[in-house]
A protein has these predicted regions:
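Small/polar/charged residue-enriched interaction surfaces, especially the RNA/DNA-contacting tracks
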Residues: 1-332
Length: 332
C-alpha cells in the first residue's frame, strides 16, 4: 500500500529572516569572505537559497527533541548504532535502521520505525515528507540589498582578549529577506500532519533557527503558510486523495493512512497503524475533482481547526507510543 498513492498534503511556506542568516557553502573559498552563503543558479542568475536538505535536517532535529520531551526514548538517534548509543540512552532509542534486516519488507520497516523515521525516513525507508529548496522571489536582488559583510574575531580562552591572527569575515543574508519552499506529504497518518504543524507553529513563533552561528544570533526566522497565489498555486493547506479508490472519504472527515488501510481490508499490525486514524471536522470541507484526485483546500478557520486537531492527535500518538518489537538481526 505504501507504494500506492493514497492521500497527500501540500503547502507553500514563506520563511522570512528576522536577523542575519548564513547557510554556509561547506567548502573553502580562494577569494572573498571566509564564510559565504550557499548559492545556486535561479531566476536567471546566481543567488542565495536555503537547500531543502538543510531545512529538512533542521525540521527533523527539532521534532526529535519535541517527541522525546513528550515521551523519552520514542524517537531514535539516527546516527547511533545499537551498541554505541550510550550517551543518549536515557533519552533517545538507538537508530531504527541499525536493527533492520537487509531484505525486510517495507511494511515491516515502517511498522518498526520510530515516529520521526516514519515521517522523515532513514537509510532503510524513504519517508513521507518532501521539502523543496527555498528560493527568493523573482527580482529580489533589485528590490533590496540581500548580502552584507561582517567581521569576526576569535577570543583567547586564557586572557579573554582577542586571539592573535584570528580575525575572520563572513557574508550573511540580511534581515527581512523572504524565501519560499514547497512541502509535500504523501500517504500520511493524521499525527504526521500534526507533527508538521508543530514544526511550522514553532517557526511562526520564531523558536527555530537555521544555518550557522545560531548561538551567536544568526539564523532567526519566521515562517507562515502562503495564502492564495496570484498564479495557479492554491493557498493554505491542500489535501487530496486518489479518485481510483472505491472508499469515499466523507466531507466532514479527514482520513489518515491507517483509516484508508483498514477500509481496504489491511490488518492494523501490517503497518503499525490504527483504523481510528481520522479526524471529524467541525464543518464540511468539500472534495473537488481535479484530474485523478479529489482535492480539499483548508484556509482561515478551517485551517486553524485542522492544525488544532492534528496537533492534538500527534501529542496523543506520542504519549501512547509503544516500542516496536525488538529486531536482533543486523543490517548486512
Amino acid at each position: 500500500m505504501l507504494k500506492a498513492l493514497v492521500n497527500e498534503a501540500r503547502l507553500r511556506l514563506d520563511i522570512t529572516t528576522k536577523g542575519p542568516l548564513l547557510v554556509k557553502t561547506g567548502y573553502a573559498t580562494v577569494i572573498g569572505a571566509d564564510m559565504a552563503p550557499v548559492m545556486t543558479y535561479h531566476n536567471g542568475q546566481q543567488e542565495v537559497y536555503i537547500p531543502g536538505s538543510s531545512l529538512k535536517g533542521v525540521f527533523r532535529s527539532h521534532i526529535e527533541k519535541v517527541v522525546n520531551s513528550i515521551k523519552p526514548r520514542v524517537a531514535c538517534n539516527p546516527l547511533s548504532e545499537r551498541e554505541d548509543a550510550r550517551d543518549d540512552r536515557h533519552l533517545y532509542r538507538p537508530s531504527c535502521s541499525s536493527g533492520f534486516k537487509k531484505d525486510m519488507p517495507t511494511q515491516a520497516v515502517y511498522a518498526a520505525s520510530c515516529p520521526t523515521c516514519r515521517l522523515f525516513g532513514s537509510t532503510s525507508y524513504i519517508g513521507r515528507i518532501v521539502v523543496e529548496d527555498a528560493y527568493l522571489p523573482a527580482k529580489a536582488y533589485e528590490e533590496k540589498k540581500l548580502i552584507e559583510h561582517r567581521d569576526g574575531i576569535a577570543i583567547d580562552r586564557l586572557t579573554g582578549g582577542t586571539g592573535g591572527g584570528a580575525k575572520f569575515d563572513l557574508e550573511v543574508v540580511t534581515e527581512g529577506t523572504t524565501f519560499t519552499t514547497d512541502i509535500h506529504l504523501r500517504n500520511f497518518e493524521i499525527w504526521q500532519l500534526g507533527m508538521l504543524f508543530v514544526i511550522i507553529q514553532d517557526m511562526q513563533d520564531e523558536l527555530i533557527r537555521i544555518g550557522s552561528g545560531r548561538s551567536r544570533g544568526l539564523g532567526k526566522v519566521k515562517a507562515s503558510i502562503r495564502g492564495q497565489d496570484e498564479g495557479s498555486q492554491q493557498g493554505g493547506v491542500v489535501l487530496s486523495t486518489t479518485r481510483a479508490y472505491k472508499s469515499k472519504e466523507p466531507d466532514k472527515e479527514l482520513w489518515g493512512l491507517g483509516r484508508w488501510l483498514a477500509d481496504e481490508g489491511e490488518d492494523e499490525k501490517t503497518y503499525g497503524t490504527r483504523r481510528t486514524d481520522l479526524l471529524t471536522l467541525p464543518q464540511e470541507v468539500a472534495h473537488v475533482p481535479s484530474g485523478i484526485r479529489n482535492v480539499r483546500v483548508f484556509n482561515g478557520e478551517t485551517l486553524d481547526k485542522l492544525k488544532e486537531q492534528s496537533i492534538e492527535s500527534f501529542v496523543i500518538q506520542i504519549e501512547q507510543w509503544t516500542d516496536a518489537p525488538q529486531i536482533t538481526t543486523q543490517r548486512r
